[in-house]
Amino acid sequence: ASFAEAPPGNPAAGEKIFKTKCAQCHTVDKGAGHKQGPNLNGLFGRQSGTTAGYSYSAANKNMAVNWGYNTLYDYLLNPKKYIPGTKMVFPGLKKPQDRADLIAYLKQSTAA
C-alpha cells in the first residue's frame, strides 16, 4: 500500500512515536548536532546520505532517495529492505497509521 492510501496522519501521535522510537538516535532541532543517526531537520526534499557532517553508509549515499511522503512511508515500513546496508537498526513501523502519524510529525517538526 502506498502513502496515497494511508490514513490521515496525526502529528501529535507522531511526536509520541518519535520520542519513543526515534529520538534515541535522531533529533529534529535546527542547528543541533548529529546523534547516533543524522539530524532530520530539513528532511523533506533532501537526498539520502547528504546531510553535512554525518558519516553515512555507502548504501544510503548510493540509493540517492529523495525524501518525501511516499519514500518515507515505504522506508519506515522496513528500512533494511528499502536500503540494504543502511546503518539504521530500527526494524520499522508495520502499522500504516503509525507511519502516517510519524510522517505528519516529521513534516511539521523538520521544516528548515
Swiss-Prot record:
Modified residues (N6,N6,N6-trimethyllysine): 80, 94
Post-translational modification note: Binds 1 heme c group covalently per subunit.
Keywords assigned by UniProt, alphabetized: Acetylation, Electron transport, Heme, Iron, Metal-binding, Methylation, Mitochondrion, Respiratory chain, Transport
Compartment(s) of residence: Mitochondrion intermembrane space
One MF term in the entry's GO annotations: metal ion binding
PANTHER family with a match to the protein in the record: CYTOCHROME C
Family that this chain belongs to: Belongs to the cytochrome c family.
Protein name: Cytochrome c
Source organism of this protein record: Acer negundo
